[in-house]
Every structure is written in structure tokens, then in C-alpha cells.
Amino acid sequence: MASIVVVGAGLGGMSAAFELRDTLGRDHSITVVGQGDRFAFTPSNPWVAIGWREPEATSLDAAECLARRGIAFNGSGVDRIDAQARQVHTGGGTVFGYDYLVICTGPKLAFDEIPGIGPDGHTQSICTLPHARRAWEQYQAFLDDPGPVVIGAVQGASCFGPAYEFAMIL
């Protein structure tokens, strides 16, 4: 029996875990390590930012969802990976040994690389569920005093689709 650890509980990590379970059956152990207890369906973030969906309607309890498929879950994040020992150390102190490691951590938002960019600067983001919720709040304030809007993505952005979708529905 192989032990597989999937690091990341977003679209990539959850999809990888489900595909592994379907392909390998239940003879192998699969554990997903994510950051937090909820799986957020990121493609719905533009809808949250415009008020078409509530954040609660676009996320699931990750442990519950994975358990139905016989997949273990730990939501305390990864502190470090010891490749020599084949171990994943979580932020909560749990150590998972593995035969195979799948890394699906997704993007790291780098708002600090451009002065003034990001939710704490002069722009809004829909990259995460909390960002989309904040964008909705800022959109409501904008409606009270409307003016020009610029929607786009900065250099190096890995995905322009959400910005285009948000522009089309706005």
C-alpha cells in the first residue's frame, strides 16, 4: 500500500486527490494537507464580487467532502517538507510520511511587488474568497459615488480570465 500526500486543497489539490482515488482505488492512503478547513470554488469569485453568490454558497467543508471518498484531510498548512525523510510537517505539528508527494499549492499573490496594488492598496482583488467579499463591499460603496472603473491584471499575472469575466458582468 502506497501513502500519497497532496499538498494544497484548492482546485488542483482536490482534483488530484479525487483522480488518484478513482485511479488507485482504496488500497492506497491519500491525505490532503491544505491551509484552512474550507475548499473555496475559486471560479465563483467574480460572482461573489458582484453579489450573485454568497461566499458560503461557493465553499465546502474540505474534510467532509474528502472523507466521503476515503481521503484524509489536515487543514493546518505545511510548515516544511523533508524530502530526504519523505515527510510533510504541518503547521499544527503533525508529520505525514509519504511514498509519493503531489504539490498543488497554487499561486502566491505578490501584491507587495507593485506599490499600491492589492486589497490593502488602491485596488481590489477577486483572487481569493475573502478578497472577492471585500471587492463586493467596495463595489457597494462605489455605487453610492460612481465614477470610472479600470479592470485588469498586472504583468506576470498567471490568469486573466477572472478579470475579463468580472469586467463583462460588471
Name these PLM-found stretches.
Residues 1-3, 146-147:
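Intrinsically disordered, low-complexity proline-rich regions
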Residues 2-72, 156-169:
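Beta1-alpha1 glycine-rich phosphate/pyrophosphate-binding loop at the start
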Residues 70-167:
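FAD-binding core/adjacent interface of flavoenzyme oxidoreductases
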